[in-house]
Amino acid sequence: MNFQQRLQSLWTLARPFCPPLLATASQMQMVVLPCLGFTLLLWSQVSGAQGQEFHFGPCQVKGVVPQKLWEAFWAVKDTMQAQDNITSARLLQQEVLQNVSDAESCYLVHTLLEFYLKTVFKNYHNRTVEVRTLKSFSTLANNFVLIVSQLQPSQENEMFSIRDSAHRRFLLFRRAFKQLDVEAALTKALGEVDILLTWMQKFYKL
């Protein structure tokens, strides 16, 4: 993927989190910092700045600092988990994340983060009205955009069984998500970001 394609890919994923040209002044005020943050993240990523490095099998991700993700989650953790009234269900259950091979991890993290971006973050974004919450929420979303943009899972035929195994894990997660009411599912998915980050950090290397 060349420089121009990478920029287009990043902007396509991030567009839902930045204001439209006709946004009101109050809306603009709410989202200007998160979008500025995304711009800085984008520039550091395409200009070669590096943070910690993730190795999801053959897929390497640079320019993302795990501590920033954790800080963003901790800022909204109590709010998200306090709103989760369904304690008997879990989306990121053991069958989804347990014993994932290195080769399988690239496919699984790609599908999970894309789902969070296109379904969870996108639909929850309009419900986030507090500036402090919105900033943390956007930090998570913007970093997920950067990670997804660098993941290029192999589509070769010999990887079919690994790709299929990762897909079946993802379907378990999505099925659990769809069994809940929309609001409850979005809240639970956000409240389980710590489970996702803990799993991802297993593939982080200095």
UniProtKB/Swiss-Prot annotation:
InterPro entries: 4_helix_cytokine-like_core, IL-10/19/20/24/26, IL-10_CS, IL-24. Up-regulated in melanoma cells induced to terminally differentiate. This is Interleukin-24. Glycosylated. Ubiquitination at Lys-122 promotes proteasomal degradation. Disulfide bonds join C59-C106. The gene is IL24. GO terms for molecular function: cytokine activity. GO terms for biological process: apoptotic process; cellular response to interleukin-4; cellular response to lipopolysaccharide; immune response; negative regulation of cell migration; negative regulation of cell population proliferation; positive regulation of cell population proliferation. Keywords: Apoptosis, Cytokine, Disulfide bond, Glycoprotein, Isopeptide bond, Secreted, Signal, Ubl conjugation. It is found in: Secreted. It comes from Homo sapiens (Human).
